[in-house]
Every structure is written in C-alpha cells, then in structure tokens.
Design a protein with these regions (language model features):
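Low-complexity, acidic/polar, glycine-enriched regions of mature
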Residues: 20-192
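Gram-negative bacterial Sec-dependent N-terminal signal peptides
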Residues: 1-22
Length: 192
C-alpha cells in the first residue's frame, strides 16, 4: 500500500509540474481588442488614423519556456476611420480589396521575452493576398485575474511599421503619399 501511495504521489507531482509548465491559451476579447493604424495623407499634410472593429484570434503563451504563438484574423470590411466615404474607398481594389481579400491575418510563430515579460512577436502579416514578415514590438504587457469573469486576462500594447506598397497597396504614391504605415494593437486575451 505504501508503494502505491508513493507511485500515486509521484504521478500527481509529475502531473502538476507538467501543467505548471504547459502553455496557456488566451482567446482575444473582441470588445477589448483594437487593431488600428496611422498612414500618411499627401506627403505629410496630415495623418489618417483608423481601426478595425472586428477581429478574432488566440495567443498561446508558454512563460516557463519563454515563447509562444499568435494567430489573429481581422475583418478588413470593418475598417473605421470616422469617415464613411474614406472607409468605402479603403475597401476598394486599390487598397484592401475587401471583396477579394476579406481578411488580414497575422501569424506569430514565436514570442521573444525580456526577462519574464513578452517583448516581441516574430511573425508574418498576410494582407491583400501578400504575406510578408512583420514583427510586433510589445510596448506593455500585464495580466490579472478579472474579478467579474474570475479568469486571468492579459492585456498588451504592440506596434509595428511596414510599407503598404509591399502588400500591393500603393495608391497615392504618385501624389506623394508616403507608404509607411504604423500598426498599433491594443488587445486583451482571456485565459481558456
């Protein structure tokens, strides 16, 4: 009996240590996740700003191994610049071509840590039918137990910069528009 108890205790300890080391999955909360952007208007005359109202995704985070992955899908027809005519234009073929390419997808293949906090997501962005490498710099990251949901929630602010012309979206270049685009992501994920 004593031998069985020792084996059971060992199995329990092994199971607990395995689950403590296992990666956690977080579902992005669509009510607290806002992919947004800044883009040039007429070579520095002003800056367009907008966001996407519909996005979904998951983040797998292994804090013990200091790595993780990310998979996010953005509905490009949910673009919102605060200007209905501009939103319509941005959905046309010279920009997102939402009829042909209804989503933009970010796939993070690894997450780099600085100490015990995520610092950068290494991955790629697929937009307008083109996939290019794009790393997200994590500006802030914090987790807490949400008192209403009784679940862990992690929030982040991340940024990246890219040339939209690399994705076949070079409208305005002949008018002097800079194609540099700054991506800002404010996100919260709920532990599953």
């Amino acid at each position: 009996m004593k031998k069985f108890s020792m084996i059971a205790a060992g199995a329990l300890a092994a199971g607990l240590s395995f689950s403590a080391m296992a990666a956690d999955t977080y579902q992005l909360d669509p009510n607290h996740t806002y992919p947004s952007f800044e883009a040039d208007h007429f070579g520095g005359v002003s800056t367009w700003r907008g966001k996407f109202n519909k996005s979904s995704g998951t983040v797998v985070l292994d804090r013990a191994a200091k790595t993780g992955t990310m998979d996010v899908t953005i509905d490009v027809s949910s673009i919102n610049t605060g200007n209905a005519k501009l939103d319509e234009h941005l959905q046309k073929a010279e920009f997102f071509d939402a009829a042909k390419y209804p989503t933009a997808v970010y796939k993070g293949t690894s997450i780099r840590f600085d100490g015990d906090k995520p610092a950068e997501v290494v991955g790629s962005l697929t937009m307008h039918g083109v996939t290019k490498p794009l790393n997200l710099k994590i500006e802030s990251f914090k987790c807490f137990v949400n008192p209403m949901m009784k679940k862990e929630v992690c929030g982040t602010e991340a940024t990246a910069t890219f040339d939209r012309g690399d994705f076949g979206m070079d409208y305005g270049k002949t008018y002097g528009f800079s194609l540099k685009t700054v991506l800002h992501i404010q996100a919260e994920g709920v532990k599953q």
